[in-house]
Amino acid sequence: MVKLRLKRCGKKQRAVYRIVAIDVRSRREGRDLRKVGFYDPIKNQTYLNIPVILYFLERGAQPTGTVQDISKRAGVFMELSSNQQTKFH
């Protein structure tokens, strides 16, 4: 199973995170399948590669709580629901 979760980067006391698609059994700093975004909690900056995130979500990837909150703020789930509606019609 694949999860979308945070991978810690940066210096001590100055953490930044990559949002990655990674196998559930891998450790936090393990090898990821693909980098799908970036999150800096100190500067409150976020970059999301939305088409890639939608690709993984449509194939059953589960976001962690924090990644889900970040994605909601960016409106990823609204795009996911609109994409699914266009597929069925």
From Swiss-Prot:
One Pfam family named in its UniProt record: Ribosomal_S16
Record-linked InterPro entries: Ribosomal_bS16, Ribosomal_bS16_CS, Ribosomal_bS16_dom_sf
S-S bonds: none
UniProt keyword Plastid, yes or no: yes
Subcellular location per the Swiss-Prot or TrEMBL entry: Plastid, Chloroplast
A single Gene Ontology CC term: small ribosomal subunit
GO molecular function: structural constituent of ribosome
Gene Ontology biological-process entries: translation
Keywords recorded for this protein, A-Z: Chloroplast, Plastid, Ribonucleoprotein, Ribosomal protein
Matches recorded under PANTHER family: 30S RIBOSOMAL PROTEIN S16, SMALL RIBOSOMAL SUBUNIT PROTEIN BS16M
Family statement: Belongs to the bacterial ribosomal protein bS16 family.
Name this polypeptide is given: Small ribosomal subunit protein bS16c
Gene this protein is translated from: rps16
